Amino acid sequence: MSETITVNCPTCGKTVVWGEISPFRPFCSKRCQLIDLGEWAAEEKRIPSSSDLSESDDWSEEPKQ
């Protein structure tokens, strides 16, 4: 027997079946998938880090020789 696994859409919270029946998983639809992508592109979402890359001593506009 196989159990039906369900998750909540991260955008709208709707229940989504985790399987081939849901091609946009974990999202419920292409719309929710694109909303999430837009939030990442607009930098509304980010992965936390311990330091800011722009303040790093290793960051430079010029390539090292």
Swiss-Prot record:
Transmembrane segments: none annotated. Binds 1 zinc ion. This is DNA gyrase inhibitor YacG. Belongs to the DNA gyrase inhibitor YacG family. HAMAP family: DNA_gyrase_inhibitor_YacG (MF_00649). One of its GO terms (molecular function) is DNA topoisomerase type II (double strand cut, ATP-hydrolyzing) inhibitor activity. It comes from the Bacteria. Inhibits all the catalytic activities of DNA gyrase by preventing its interaction with DNA. Acts by binding directly to the C-terminal domain of GyrB, which probably disrupts DNA binding by the gyrase. It comes from Escherichia coli O6:H1 (strain CFT073 / ATCC 700928 / UPEC). Its cofactor is Zn(2+). Residues 54-65 have a biased composition (Acidic residues). Zn(2+) binds at C9, C12, C28, C32. Interacts with GyrB. Keywords: Metal-binding, Zinc. GO terms for biological process: regulation of DNA-templated transcription.
